[in-house]
Amino acid sequence: MARLSSLLSFSLALLTFLHGSTAQQFPNECQLDQLNALEPSHVLKAEAGRIEVWDHHAPQLRCSGVSFVRYIIESKGLYLPSFFSTARLSFVAKGEGLMGRVVLCAETFQDSSVFQPSGGSPFGEGQGQGQQGQGQGHQGQGQGQQGQQGQQGQQSQGQGFRDMHQKVEHIRTGDTIATHPGVAQWFYNDGNQPLVIVSVLDLASHQNQLDRNPRPFYLAGNNPQGQVWIEGREQQPQKNILNGFTPEVLAKAFKIDVRTAQQLQNQQDNRGNIIRVQGPFSVIRPPLRSQRPQEEVNGLEETICSARCTDNLDDPSNADVYKPQLGYISTLNSYDLPILRFLRLSALRGSIRQNAMVLPQWNANANAVLYVTDGEAHVQVVNDNGDRVFDGQVSQGQLLSIPQGFSVVKRATSEQFRWIEFKTNANAQINTLAGRTSVLRGLPLEVISNGYQISLEEARRVKFNTIETTLTHSSGPASYGGPRKADA
């Protein structure tokens, strides 16, 4: 009995220690008395673009447990495939292009419409040009057709089989892209203007088994400037992961000659991680998303191979809050994009006109990182001590981190203010201070009157004068002349 009691005591002590070491890895990191609008601290230049990195050691980003990166890809620029050890949520701030991800699934895009799989073909999962293969539905149509299929397979192989690869998607301004840890991803700019993509990396995620440093793993190319993301590390050129293996091992693994294996290592390549494509970029391109019918999905049928990873937040007709004279706000969570349930991230897109204001609110269960894509706004943020830790302008290209529970209000000071917020919860929730669904609206008048030492009539005005839920005008106090029609 004594032995059992000692074992239980040891187990409880161990659990307490492990929980404490995890939860308090960075003690007092969120005792912030000042926030700042942040700019990139490092720039990695490449042949056809650049990668701009924010300092994730900045106190407000360290509190949120995230890192932030901006990719600027020039026309005909190809961001070479890479992966991170963290979950990543990206937003296309400008431009259009192509995106590919590689997960542990068979290739589903094939560029030869005449190809039919024969019995001994290694490409038995082919489904035709630009189509996705989901199983073995086209692997034979009965015993009587096997001979014909074999002949077709031999004919097509004689004609030459060009390529098959995993899914490629068109991306455009407003797209939000979710990416699992360890999933290789590439981008190509097939437009005429720069393709700008911003990404948040959840360093504090349970899926990141390394330290709180963003670590890109490159499958191709080299980074001559080294890993500027990791503080204290001597900046040596960062090579792709194939460079670490001997050419002989690569030759055996890929069934190629040693010379080709050496080329895979990119040892003499100083173009960086964004290279310029010479000539046409021939990949299998699916129909544009606007040409495909909208389908109702519940996420239950999705697998890692078929899961949607992209959704567009720039369509006002799909907004959660829309007022033509003020603007709109759209949210993206795991109900809209089920993959976010595993990433434990979500996003909010806002676009408001001059003098429109987002009513004071706080994130109940998430940290938020606000990135300005267009225009300017005046923002105030208040911490748990009731101190105003930020009171100033934010403008295009700047970043502001808003910790959980910190109250924030935004007012557009330019003709239009647009931003994207990344949040560290798959279903982030907000509470408002003013408005129809606010915390003060839910309190009894007596509580408001006694709590703020105001009359019942003043308490009634505090509680009921603002009938909007999210967006309102900031040009002056509301009119008290009569009832107003409630809207968003």
UniProtKB/Swiss-Prot annotation:
Biased composition (Low complexity): 148-160
Main subcellular localisation: endoplasmic reticulum
Signal peptide: 1-23
Cystine bridges: C30-C63, C105-C305
GO cellular component, one term: rough endoplasmic reticulum
GO process annotations (BP): seed maturation
Biased composition annotated in UniProt, kind: Gly residues: 121-147
Location within or outside the cell: Rough endoplasmic reticulum
Annotated region described as Disordered, given as residue ranges: 116-163
Keywords assigned: Disulfide bond, Endoplasmic reticulum, Seed storage protein, Signal, Storage protein
The Cupin type-1 domain, residue ranges: 35-262, 311-460
Superkingdom classification of source: Eukaryota
Pfam families: Cupin_1 (PF00190)
Gene Ontology MF terms in the entry: nutrient reservoir activity
PROSITE patterns, alphabetized: 11S_SEED_STORAGE
Entry function: This is a seed storage protein.
The family this protein is said to belong to: Belongs to the 11S seed storage protein (globulins) family.
PANTHER family for this protein: 12S SEED STORAGE PROTEIN CRA1, OS03G0336100 PROTEIN-RELATED
Record note on quaternary structure: Hexamer; each subunit is composed of an acidic and a basic chain derived from a single precursor and linked by a disulfide bond.
Full protein name: Cruciferin
